[in-house]
Amino acid sequence: FLGGLMKIGAKLLPSVIGLFKKKQ
């Protein structure tokens, strides 16, 4: 379960960082 969460997080992280950079 934890491994699955980390895989999902690894996929979402770049998108979240991209959105955060666009806002600044």
UniProtKB/Swiss-Prot annotation:
Domain of life: Eukaryota
A Gene Ontology term for the protein's cellular component: extracellular region
An example Gene Ontology molecular-function term: toxin activity
Record-linked InterPro entries: Antimicrobial_4
Tissue: Expressed by the venom gland.
Principal cellular location given in the protein's record: secreted
Any one of the GO BP annotations: defense response to fungus
Keyword Membrane belongs to the record: yes
Record keywords: Antibiotic, Antimicrobial, Fungicide, Membrane, Secreted, Target cell membrane, Target membrane, Toxin
Signal peptide coordinates: none
Subcellular location, record wording: Secreted; Target cell membrane
Record carries keyword Nucleotide-binding: no
Alphabetical list of Pfam families matching this protein: Antimicrobial_4
Family assignment from sequence similarity: Belongs to the non-disulfide-bridged peptide (NDBP) superfamily. Medium-length antimicrobial peptide (group 3) family. Ponericin-W subfamily.
Purpose of the protein: Has a broad spectrum of activity against both Gram-positive and Gram-negative bacteria and S.cerevisiae. Has insecticidal and hemolytic activities. May act by disrupting the integrity of the bacterial cell membrane.
UniProt-recorded name of the protein: U1-poneritoxin-Na1a
